[in-house]
């Protein structure tokens, strides 16, 4: 299993390849706000662990294993953002909140959150009911 840091790199590499068709060390460094030398070290580790194939000065490609995990990590991130919107978290806080929790949840918890998102999306009245509960709770605390 990849570490949380490895997951961040795999997720970002997956997104860059999906968006641009390739991922360079400089692109990864910029996206993650880290030094290129840190990216090179992590890419070498990901290569060793068979998440990607890296050739110095030639670039990198995700292996089947890396693509599968990258896809799952992007799904997890997107699902958690969706969940945060449903429960009414301020849009400006969602990204950082998701970044703060995504590595600490089991895949079982992610699957259950997926069930909950689906439950709310099946009927808009459910979301409105939740909003009513939230408004009532806000009034109590004021």
UniProtKB/Swiss-Prot annotation:
Q: What does the UniProt record say this protein does? A: Central regulator of manganese homeostasis.
Family classification: Belongs to the DtxR/MntR family.
| Organism of derivation | Bacillus cereus (strain G9842)
Q: Decide whether keyword Secreted is in the record.
A: no
Kindly list the GO molecular function terms attached to this UniProt entry.
DNA binding; DNA-binding transcription factor activity; manganese ion binding; protein dimerization activity
Coarse class of the protein's main subcellular location: cytoplasm
Q: How is this protein organized at the quaternary level?
A: Homodimer.
Q: Which SUPFAM superfamilies match?
A: Iron-dependent repressor protein, dimerization domain (SSF47979), Winged helix' DNA-binding domain (SSF46785)
Enumerate the UniProt keywords alphabetically. Answer: Activator, Cytoplasm, DNA-binding, Manganese, Metal-binding, Repressor, Transcription, Transcription regulation
One cellular component GO annotation, for this chain's record? cytoplasm
GO annotations under biological process?
intracellular manganese ion homeostasis
User: Binding of Mn(2+) 2: at which residues?
Assistant: 11, 77, 99, 102
HTH dtxR-type domain residues: 1-63
- For binding Mn(2+) 1, which residues are annotated in this chain's numbering? 8, 99, 102-103
Question: What modulates its activity?
Answer: DNA binding is strongly activated by Mn(2+).
One Pfam match, given by its short name, reads Fe_dep_repr_C
Q: Where in the cell is it found?
A: Cytoplasm
- Its protein name is HTH-type transcriptional regulator MntR
